[in-house]
């Protein structure tokens, strides 16, 4: 059976991982967190002193994921999307969180002041939404609110419904 590939993207702290893991457990799709994948495989290309974090080696990440993506049935979670091949994804969801809620979430993660400010600005200017629209066909890019627990449940149900329709439309 053909299964779709889904991209969950958005600023750090918007709830991609929570949504992705829950979605995978309810849909049977495979969940991949690109940050974890990079950590496990040391898929880095240096270190960013200013942000105090490793720099992702995007080419190696793409190489690492290629086979799984071509098989289908994968949920990918990452706070960027412009380096993934367009052909990989059947739908892209950009999660969006109110700035005050996002600020608290990132503060709880121990983000330093610069990282906090930059991520909040990223959300204000909808950088990830713009990046998704520039990287994929507009009709497959959707924004989802991610502020409260009810949003999580609504988003899961909406995406599960979409998966069901996609599978039906693509079965022989």
From Swiss-Prot:
Residues 33-56 are annotated as: NMPbind. ATP binds at residues 13, 15-18, 109, 148. GO terms for biological process: ribosomal small subunit biogenesis; rRNA processing. One of its GO terms (molecular function) is adenylate kinase activity. Coiled coil: none annotated. It comes from the Eukaryota. It is an enzyme of class 2 (transferase). Broad-specificity nucleoside monophosphate (NMP) kinase that catalyzes the reversible transfer of the terminal phosphate group between nucleoside triphosphates and monophosphates. Also has ATPase activity. Involved in the late cytoplasmic maturation steps of the 40S ribosomal particles, specifically 18S rRNA maturation. While NMP activity is not required for ribosome maturation, ATPase activity is. Associates transiently with small ribosomal subunit protein uS11. ATP hydrolysis breaks the interaction with uS11. This is Adenylate kinase isoenzyme 6. It comes from Bos taurus (Bovine).
């Amino acid at each position: 059976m053909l299964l779709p590939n889904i991209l969950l993207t958005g600023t750090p702290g918007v709830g991609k991982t929570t949504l992705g893991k829950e979605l995978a457990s309810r849909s049977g799709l495979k969940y991949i967190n690109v940050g974890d994948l990079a950590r496990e495989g040391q898929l880095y290309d240096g270190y960013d002193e200013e942000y105090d974090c490793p720099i992702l080696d995007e080419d190696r990440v793409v190489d690492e994921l290629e086979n799984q993506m071509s098989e289908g049935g994968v949920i990918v979670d990452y706070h960027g999307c412009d380096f993934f091949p367009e052909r990989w994804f059947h739908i892209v969801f950009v999660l969006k969180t109110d700035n005050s809620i996002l600020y608290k979430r990132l503060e709880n993660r121990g983000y330093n002041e610069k990282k906090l400010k930059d991520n909040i600005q990223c959300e204000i200017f909808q950088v990830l939404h713009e990046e998704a629209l520039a990287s994929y066909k507009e009709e497959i890019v959707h924004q989802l609110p991610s502020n409260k627990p009810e949003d999580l449940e609504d988003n899961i149900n909406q995406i599960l419904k979409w998966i069901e329709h996609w599978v039906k439309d693509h079965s022989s």
